A protein has these predicted regions:
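Short, small-residue-enriched loops and turns at beta-alpha junctions
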Residues: 1, 23-25, 42-46, 70-74
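Divalent metal-binding pocket/active-site signature
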Residues: 1-24
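Generic hydrophobic/aromatic pocket-lining and core-packing "Φ" positions
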Residues: 3, 26-27, 51-52, 83
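Glycine-enriched alpha-helix->loop->beta-strand junction motifs that scaffold or abut catalytic
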Residues: 6-14, 30-37, 59-62
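Active-site glycine- and acidic-residue-rich loops that bind
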Residues: 17-19, 39-48
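A short, acidic, amphipathic alpha-helical segment used as a generic capping/interface helix at domain edges
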Residues: 47-56
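Short acidic/histidine-rich active-site segments
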Residues: 60-77
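Mid-to-C-terminal alpha-helical segments outside catalytic/metal-binding sites
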Residues: 80-150
């Protein structure tokens, strides 16, 4: 239903991520041109063993492997664990990189605000900086750290 609503409103499916997929939904999502994301959860929804089989069957185009750290049983390290399992099961490194990293970066980076350099070359912390004239501070002295480790 959500894909139909997106299409009815003229959204470009190649710019829409449909998450929480499984083996039963992935084909329809990909066939309609959307990006299929899979949140890997232990014991529920999508597991990493099943994710390996999805990538073997459908390839790495328009597929994103993600994880969660929410109120239920979840594993924030599910993506690297799934990537490792993919490699062990013979999936090519380039396909692992695409599904577990690059595809997400490509789509979420289209807004121009999320760039790989943000975490590959992080800046030091400077709490004296303001965002829209607002600060995270509540009366305390700003923390300013350099990128240097002394």
């Amino acid at each position: 239903k959500s894909m139909d609503v997106c299409l009815e409103h003229g959204l470009d499916p190649s710019k829409v991520v449909i998450d929480h997929n499984n083996e039963e939904t992935v084909k329809d999502v990909l066939d309609k041109g959307f990006i299929a994301a899979f949140t890997i959860y232990p014991k529920t929804k999508m597991g990493n063993e099943r994710m390996v089989e999805v990538v073997k069957k459908y390839g790495s185009n328009n597929i994103i492997v993600d994880s969660s750290a929410d109120w239920g049983v979840s594993d924030p390290l599910a993506v690297p664990k799934t990537a490792s399992l993919m490699l062990k099961r013979g999936i090519a490194r380039e396909d692992v990189v695409k599904t577990c990293y690059q595809n997400a970066l490509d789509i979420f980076g289209t807004n121009g605000k999320m760039k790989e350099e943000h975490w590959l070359s992080p800046k030091g912390i400077d709490q004296a900086q303001l965002y829209n004239d607002n600060s995270v501070l509540r009366g305390q002295k700003p923390r300013v750290d350099s990128d240097q480790i002394n």
